[in-house]
Each structure stands twice: as C-alpha cells, then as structure tokens.
Design a protein with these regions (language model features):
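Short S/T/G/P-rich N-terminal loop/turn motif that feeds into the first structured element of a domain
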Residues: 1-123, 130-145, 151-178
Length: 178
C-alpha cells in the first residue's frame, strides 16, 4: 500500500485526483490556520503517483491500537529524516518496530499508527487517537524507553517536525497491510 500527503482546502476535500478512489482517506485540520492536510492510501505506487503529489510514500508498518475501529479525533504527524539519509530512515523504522511499538501498543485510545517512507528516505509517522491526552501518554512512554543495545543514538536524532492536529474525517481501510 502507498500514500500521498497534500495540503487541501478542507471545504473541498471530496475532490480526488488520480486513478480511481483511494482505499482510505484521513483529513486533518491545519495546526496554524485555515486549510488542512489530506492523507490518501492507495493500492499501489502507480495509483498514488497519478495524483500528482510531490512525494509518494510506501506504507511500511501499521499498528492497530486498542481503540481500533473507533473514530479518531486527534492525529500526531511526525516528520523524520528530512535530509533523506537512508541509515537514519532505517534506524527510525527499526526503533519503531522493535522498541516503540511494543512500548505503546497497550495504550488505551490509540486507534492506528501508519509508518510511511518515501523513495528518498523521508519517514512520516501518522498516529491516530481518540483523544489529545493519548498522544501525550504515547510521547511520555516513548521518552521513557531505553535504547536497545543495537541502536545507534547518533542515527536517532529525533523528529524534524511534530504536528498535533484534529482529525476532521477518517475513512481507514478495514485491513491495512504494509
């Protein structure tokens, strides 16, 4: 599965460009004014590319939380590795799968987490939750985890940007697979 992320006029979010309808869509409010962000999930890279989006992401991991199936109200969008270093992207994905995911999986209120990676090694993590406080608990939990013995702290430089925003609408596929 693949994804596109683009800025949108939230009043006109029904318009989709590309080859057919996306498998799923999440529309997020802007953190700093009018407008918003639309995340579309596509069955393949070709469908995603036909949207004309600046960047196409591959969905590399999906975590269904304890609140899976409930309507998400808040999203945390974490942008990692803006310089496109493949080693940093690999390290971030490894940390996510082997350290962070096990630590946060049991947190109440987490609906779903999507990990996206572009061909130029940018990583975006979209966490969907039923409340703002859930994202705060996730952050506290992540910061309390110790690095694994095989993690290199030099490659884990943190997020480039973190946006905590309201979810305006979310239509997630029932069986997202990476």
């Amino acid at each position: 599965m693949h994804a596109t992320i683009r800025a949108v006029d939230v009043a006109a979010t029904a318009a989709t460009t590309g080859d057919g309808d996306p498998l799923g869509t999440v529309v997020l409010a802007s953190s700093d004014g009018p407008g918003g962000t639309r995340l579309d999930l596509w069955p393949d890279a070709a469908s995603a590319a036909r949207t004309g989006a600046d960047r196409v992401y591959r969905v590399t991991d999906v975590m269904h939380g304890l609140a899976a199936g409930r309507r998400p109200l808040f999203a945390q969008v974490t942008w990692i590795n803006g310089d496109g270093d493949p080693a940093r992207a690999d390290a971030a994905e490894y940390a996510g799968r082997h350290r962070i995911r096990p630590a946060v999986h049991g947190i109440e209120g987490v609906v779903e987490v999507l990990v996206l990676r572009s061909d130029d090694h940018r990583v975006v993590v979209v966490g969907l939750a039923t409340g703002r406080e859930t994202h705060q608990e996730v952050q506290r939990t992540i910061m309390a985890t110790a690095l694994l013995p095989d993690e290199d702290p030099a490659l884990l430089t943190g997020a480039d940007r973190i946006d905590l925003v309201r979810v305006l609408s979310a239509e997630l596929p029932t069986a997202v697979r990476s």
